[in-house]
């Protein structure tokens, strides 16, 4: 028989068999950018959940306000819900304006005067602020002029009684600030009691000048005979201007300006002793959107 060698199988060392993770160092704290990247999917999921929840509530509110059966409109798209909400809010705004006019007939004039004041402030800022793109400035002022045309084209109030003060008529003033120190803006007045054609009056044309000022070109049929103009005028700072009048002379604009068929608007400069007091009309409180 072979001799017993007495050899034993080698056993694994407890140190060698220890897992490698036992010697792993703890994680370092993540930076803010890494934390944002890791939490971005969670934040996006929460944001979408908030949007969907708000749209669901808005859908129930708008269907209830429009008195529509929610079971027949159970699968409205998000765009449909938003469009229905916008239309409903516009109708509410018109209804509130009509109710305010029935309670106080001077509200519309105050609204126009307030919008005009805001437009003058925006125009003054754009004229004095440096670094504003000329195209952006022209588009913004063109949009404001279009909005002003829509406001002026709204239903006018009946003429005030003979004994009513003149300041209740709420004339509309439109003025652009000058870019030089030697000129002051002279507002031309359009009484809100005068009837204008809304289809024609809304079509203002904005023509920028080389010196940074802007001019509004108004079509010929926009003003019936005897009506006052709505256009910015400037006069010398030492001579006050009282009223403006409309001439039937036709204007031939320079080349490149689409202004054919327009009427020229003149201003009559009178001494201060003969001038009236139209400034008192603007002391009436105006409506402001803030």
Curated annotation (Swiss-Prot):
InterPro entries: bHLH_dom, HES_HEY, HLH_DNA-bd_sf, Orange_dom. Has a particular type of basic domain (presence of a helix-interrupting proline) that binds to the N-box (CACNAG), rather than the canonical E-box (CANNTG). Residues 10-23 have a biased composition (Low complexity). The keyword DNA-binding applies. One of its GO terms (cellular component) is nucleus. Transcription repression requires formation of a complex with a corepressor protein of the Groucho/TLE family. Its main location: nucleus. Residues 25-36 have a biased composition (Basic and acidic residues). Transmembrane segments: none annotated. The gene is HES1. CDD domains: bHLH-O_HES1_4 (cd11459). This is Transcription factor HES-1. Keywords: DNA-binding, Nucleus, Repressor, Transcription, Transcription regulation. A motif (WRPW motif) lies at residues 287-290.
């Amino acid at each position: 028989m072979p001799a017993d060698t007495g050899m034993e199988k080698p056993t694994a060392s407890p140190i060698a068999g220890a897992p490698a993770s036992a010697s792993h160092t703890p994680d370092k704290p993540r930076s803010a950018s890494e934390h944002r990247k890791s939490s971005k999917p969670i934040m996006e999921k929460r944001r979408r959940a908030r949007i969907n929840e708000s749209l669901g509530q808005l859908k129930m509110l708008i269907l209830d306000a429009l008195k529509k059966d929610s079971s027949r409109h159970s699968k409205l798209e998000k765009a449909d819900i938003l469009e229905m909400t916008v239309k409903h809010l516009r109708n509410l705004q018109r209804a509130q304006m009509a109710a305010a006019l029935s309670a106080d007939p001077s509200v519309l004039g105050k609204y126009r005067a307030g919008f005009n004041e805001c437009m003058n402030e925006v125009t003054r800022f754009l004229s004095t602020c440096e670094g504003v793109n000329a195209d952006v400035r022209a588009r913004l002022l063109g949009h404001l002029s279009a909005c002003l045309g829509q406001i002026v084209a709204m239903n006018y109030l009946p003429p005030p009684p003979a004994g009513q003060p003149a300041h209740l008529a709420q004339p509309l003033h439109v003025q652009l600030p000058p870019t030089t120190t030697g000129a002051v803006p002279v507002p031309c007045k359009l009484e809100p009691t005068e009837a204008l054609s809304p289809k024609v009056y809304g079509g203002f044309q904005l023509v920028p000048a080389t010196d940074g000022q802007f001019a509004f070109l108004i079509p010929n049929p926009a003003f019936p005979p005897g009506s006052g103009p709505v256009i910015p005028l400037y006069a010398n700072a030492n001579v006050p201007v009282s009223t403006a009048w409309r001439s039937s002379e036709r204007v031939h604009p320079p080349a490149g300006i689409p202004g054919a068929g327009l009427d020229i608007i003149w201003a009559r400069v009178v001494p201060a002793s003969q001038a009236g007091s139209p400034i008192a009309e603007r002391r009436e409180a105006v409506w402001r959107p803030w």
